[in-house]
Amino acid sequence: MFKSFFPKPGTFFLSAFVWALIAVIFWQAGGGDWVARITGASGQIPISAARFWSLDFLIFYAYYIVCVGLFALFWFIYSPHRWQYWSILGTALIIFVTWFLVEVGVAVNAWYAPFYDLIQTALSSPHKVTIEQFYREVGVFLGIALIAVVISVLNNFFVSHYVFRWRTAMNEYYMANWQQLRHIEGAAQRVQEDTMRFASTLENMGVSFINAIMTLIAFLPVLVTLSAHVPELPIIGHIPYGLVIAAIVWSLMGTGLLAVVGIKLPGLEFKNQRVEAAYRKELVYGEDDATRATPPTVRELFSAVRKNYFRLYFHYMYFNIARILYLQVDNVFGLFLLFPSIVAGTITLGLMTQITNVFGQVRGAFQYLINSWTTLVELMSIYKRLRSFEHELDGDKIQEVTHTLS
């Protein structure tokens, strides 16, 4: 699954994590400020699309390119791989675009406060605000949104090619060793379907995880700052950094709840694919052999399919009750925390909108597992099938892939 696309996967991912950690620590610990002072960057980032080509952002772009370039150069020399440009540089590009789209969210959040304060001023003091001011603020938002739309579309196009290259790498790897694998139940489905589903699902999960981490890095300091405007929480009362603590506790409660109620789902999904594969294989044999796929055999196999599906439906029923109930309460949880401050009149409409947006971003990042649980169940099921598939190759000499396909 990984060795077909990445060079020495275990070492590669460990080195990528360590190198990324070093780069982030250097930048956050003062390296970014040091570079900004040398280059004369002001640190004042405009609340508009111009922020994305301001000197501060251009410095970070250059820093990212240097870090990725050094890492890629090392791996190109240390362990050349047929798919190295897609697996290393392609992954780095996806990570960069994910960060960029998070920064778009930061820009929109910065725009919320002045825009909604402008609305509050207009509603409370007639004719004090001109319509041109509203047009100007909407123009600022549209400028940011246009960049986000263009980048998102281009990123989706690139990711589609990235996923197909990964699928191609796995397909080549398995087909090079097909004679060892062809006798395994459902081997054709593993190569034809599961490689595609694994690459696309893991890529989506990976991007979502990176997005959650970068969202926390970008929005958590903002939430810490905004917590000063909300000194009291309902029921609890006064608590420092209450919004941050509430986001963490609420997200952990939801994650723990779904982990408990959904613990059986991955195993059932895995078993479901096995009984489906057995049923499908018997039908395929029956197309060419009249002695196969007889009614008693088919009834027995389909009975196993029905039994497993009914068990799956039952377990998903109480899982979805817990998940949907939690998410419905979650929709109003952020606003519920602001009730004391709203009643006391200590926050404006713009500040309230900004706080609820930032709180939602941080809470959503902490709720990564909650939002991805059903996808995670599917991914674990696919991984189990492919891993059991690859056990046939463990300990055997793997045939090298010599042909090319790009």
UniProtKB/Swiss-Prot annotation:
UniProt keyword annotations, A-Z: Cell inner membrane, Cell membrane, Membrane, Peptide transport, Protein transport, Transmembrane, Transmembrane helix, Transport
Membrane topology recorded in Swiss-Prot or TrEMBL: Multi-pass membrane protein
Main location: membrane
GO cellular component terms, semicolon-separated: plasma membrane
GO molecular function, one term: peptide transmembrane transporter activity
Loss of function: phenotype: Mutants are resistant to proline-rich antimicrobial peptides of eukaryotic origin.
Record-given protein name: Peptide antibiotic transporter SbmA
Gene source species: Escherichia coli (strain K12)
Taxonomic lineage: Bacteria, Pseudomonadati, Pseudomonadota, Gammaproteobacteria, Enterobacterales
